[in-house]
């Protein structure tokens, strides 16, 4: 294990867009990953940054992100690539970080490498969501993979941790019933909330006022109108059920109308996962909250995200 005063880690790059928000299929996990990697480059204080990727072009994406963060720095860091088939080289660093629940797969990769042993390095995964079936499979597989107490599966909140623990408990009960297992081991599930770089999102007061005025004009909002903003993927199955919000806004709109109050608007700034989602969400909005004016805005653009 690495005993340096500032422990380093190897960042796994599963795909070119794993740490980028510029792609067409933007998800919250990519935004979180981008923020984490940028902060790692900016604040870790290391002179060497390591990644593990299947291909050189994926490692080059990692290096380009680092070079962008370190523009203007006098001391230029070194960016190093470890190919997946050379996973044993992580021994010199001490920890492998994966931006998803990939601990089980990586533990098997560690075990199958003839030059690596289980105690050479820790594997740490991150669980951004627990709703998708593939994510649940990856988490459950930790119970039958060569995963040890020095590995970990990070949860960004207590609610996610509770969900993951319940899933593992159910899977462990099944293994005891079906296979007669007497010992089932799972890694720690530490809670580490996601950090937000507030300074990167902040704007001077004058710019804030200008942005606000421009958007309200674009959405045809009067000074008296009330606007509710939703920002995120518009996916009814794997992101969020918007029905409680739509119901509440319809009740609020009816009350405002009865009191001759301001008009209520809802801006859904996001992006649809599929045509099915778009068709059904638009129909649901029209049916559930007919007294609320709804505006759909593409939330993937830099202007909208700012």
Kindly give the residue locations of the regions a language model identified:
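Short donor-sugar binding/catalytic loops of nucleotide-sugar-dependent glycosyltransferases
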Residues: 18, 231-238, 272-273, 300
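Nucleotide-activated donor-binding/catalytic signature segment of Leloir-type glycosyltransferases, i.e.
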Residues: 260-272, 278-306
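Short hydrophobic "strand-cap" motifs at the C-terminus of beta-strands
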Residues: 126-127, 156, 195, 230-234, ...
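N-terminal pre-catalytic "stem/leader" segment of glycosyltransferase-like enzymes
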Residues: 1-93
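Nucleotide-sugar donor-binding and catalytic loop/hinge architecture
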Residues: 114-118, 183, 205-227, 255-261
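Conserved donor-binding/catalytic core segment of Leloir-type glycosyltransferases
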Residues: 222-239, 246
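Extended catalytic core of nucleotide-activated donor transferases of GT-like folds
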Residues: 57-146
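A short, active-site helix/loop in glycosyltransferases that binds the activated sugar's phosphate group
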Residues: 140-211
């Amino acid at each position: 294990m690495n005993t340096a005063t500032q422990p380093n880690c190897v960042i796994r790059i599963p795909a070119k867009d794993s740490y980028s928000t510029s792609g067409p299929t933007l998800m919250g996990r990519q935004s979180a990953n981008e923020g984490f990697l940028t902060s790692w480059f900016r604040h870790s204080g290391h002179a060497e940054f390591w990644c593990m990727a299947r291909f050189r072009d994926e490692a080059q994406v990692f290096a380009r992100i680092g070079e962008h963060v370190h523009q203007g720095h006098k001391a230029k860091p070194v960016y190093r690539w470890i190919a997946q088939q050379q996973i044993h080289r992580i021994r010199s660093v001490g920890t492998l970080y994966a931006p998803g629940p990939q601990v089980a797969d990586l533990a098997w990769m560690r075990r199958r490498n003839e030059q690596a042993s289980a105690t050479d390095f820790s594997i740490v995964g991150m669980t951004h969501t627990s709703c998708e079936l593939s994510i649940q499979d990856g988490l459950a597989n930790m119970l039958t993979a060569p995963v040890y107490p020095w590995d970990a599966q990070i949860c960004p909140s207590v609610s996610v941790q509770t969900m993951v623990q319940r899933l593992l408990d159910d899977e462990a009960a099944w293994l005891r019933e079906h296979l007669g297992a007497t010992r089932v081991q799972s890694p720690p599930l530490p809670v580490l909330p996601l950090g937000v770089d507030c300074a990167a999102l902040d704007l001077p007061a004058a710019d804030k006022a200008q942005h606000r005025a421009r958007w309200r004009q674009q959405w045809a909002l009067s000074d008296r109108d009330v606007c509710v903003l939703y920002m995120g993927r518009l996916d009814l199955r794997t992101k969020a059920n918007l029905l409680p919000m739509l119901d509440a806004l319809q009740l609020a709109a009816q009350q405002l109308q009865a009191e001759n109050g301001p008009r209520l608007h809802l801006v859904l700034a996001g992006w649809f996962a599929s045509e099915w989602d778009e068709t059904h969400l638009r129909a649901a909005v029209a049916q559930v909250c007919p007294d609320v004016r709804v505006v759909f805005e593409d939330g993937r653009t830099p202007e909208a995200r700012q």
